[in-house]
Design a protein with these regions (language model features):
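Hydrophobic residues in well-ordered beta-strands that form the structural core
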Residues: 220-222
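Active-site groove signature of glycoside hydrolases
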Residues: 254-272
């Protein structure tokens, strides 16, 4: 494991750290170290690596696109969708990465602010003999986002976005929330003040924050931090020679990873 904290090199995404000693513009307190949840997990070599879930409310279905760590002939994926303990839909199919699987949901209940209904999703990977290789618990929300003219629509209905600008800073920990309750409390306070969501400003938020947003019906705009490229260095009084190709490549890979990680959260309605 190699970690490089290169704030001034111009090739590493900065978050929103200032390249100067003091905060300036939209660049704030510098931070270092591991600032989000990190863990080691033993996984099955033939288990489920990830699964994208695409809701389609117009056809009343959830579309699953699984990906596996490796493929073995005879392995099968079992998907079960339930609501309040009642099974809504299920299927079984040979394991194959990247192949969409459609599951029709009877009498679908939509996810929306005020009524954030979530479906429980259970995955199993079994070999040809029926042995359980992997088991994953997840959830999904049925919702649709689109724009008509200058209006935003959620589930085919116009919604006014009354959003706060959430910086994701904490008195204790700077970028790191002291506890799960602190993440939840930010959403609760915003909703009590009459807001229905937040623009998550220049920060890839903790996954647990998105979990609470999903559970509480809180709309969010996911946003990538400062690219770290030196477009405005002279105005900030810092002079750097920047490899823009390397910088853009780093930004592109980091941004793709962030979107991929948070793709399934129904509370995220836009990326900026």
């Amino acid at each position: 494991l190699h970690v490089t904290d290169d704030t001034r090199g111009g090739c590493q995404p900065l978050g929103k750290q200032s390249v100067r000693w003091k905060s300036a513009g939209c660049s704030y307190t510098r931070t270092t170290g591991i600032w989000q949840t990190v863990w080691l997990e033993k996984v099955s070599p033939q288990g489920l690596k990830k699964c994208r879930i695409i809701p389609d409310i117009d056809r009343g279905m959830l579309i699953f696109i699984p990906e596996f760590h490796s493929l073995q002939s005879g392995n099968a994926l079992y998907i079960q969708v339930s609501s309040h303990g009642e099974i809504c839909a299920r299927t079984a199919l040979p394991c194959s990465s990247g192949i969409p699987v459609e599951l029709k949901i009877p009498s679908p209940v939509l996810w929306e602010p005020g009524k954030p209904h979530l479906y429980d999703v259970h995955y199993e990977v079994r070999n040809a003999g029926g042995e359980l290789l992997d088991s994953v618990e997840s959830y999904a929300g049925l919702r649709k986002c689109h724009v008509e003219g200058n209006r935003f629509y959620l589930n085919n209905q116009p919604v006014f976005l009354r959003l706060v600008l959430d910086q994701g800073f904490y008195p204790k920990g700077i970028w790191t929330a002291p506890s799960d309750e602190d993440l939840k409390q930010d959403i609760e306070l915003s909703m009590k003040a009459g807001f229905n969501g937040a623009r998550l400003h220049q920060k890839v938020f903790e996954e647990r924050f998105h979990y609470w947003a999903d559970r509480m019906g809180y709309l969010t705009w996911g946003e990538f931090p400062d690219w770290g490229l030196a477009f405005w260095d002279h105005s900030f009084g810092v002079d750097r020679k920047v490899d823009h190709y390397r910088g853009f490549s780093n930004h592109r890979s980091e941004w793709a990873a962030a979107v991929d990680r948070d793709f399934n959260h129904p509370s995220i309605i836009a990326w900026t």
